[in-house]
């Protein structure tokens, strides 16, 4: 497991922040039918019970948006991933199918409202991560997005540089079909509420769909 430190600048901007990190050995696949049955069921539930305007008021998403503002980012322009995924489904656009690890992280993010970083643990440089705030000119290549302006965004950094924000993770540490160890980080900008449930939900999906024993969970703040 990695050591994860929360910087003073994050603690000042979001004193209630708490996180859960989950590390596990996994076997990734291109597609899993059982997982997609769960994703499709959630999509039907969300679109039949939610209005577009409700999304930003979901408690975890709301707290993440408020943290963006305090860190210096406009959440209307740079949406937290959980919000962006829900808005996508509400517009009638299906969730993109990437691979089983990415898809199951997206499902937990959709269900809980937490923005979750999913990383190939073997691509992370060093054994220590720190959550800070992005700086002007700090280079960050978002997955499928190209260069992302992370100034004012919460960002996890390894010994080489940024690897993940609540808007997008970095191409350098992304999961793919060759991934055999996952590090998933659940970001609780609303505090500890729901963290354990989200982390255990990831564990359950990993056990069900990636031949994993579920790995271990560490909480940090």
What are these regions (language model features)?
Residues 1-221:
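Charge-biased, low-complexity intrinsically disordered regions
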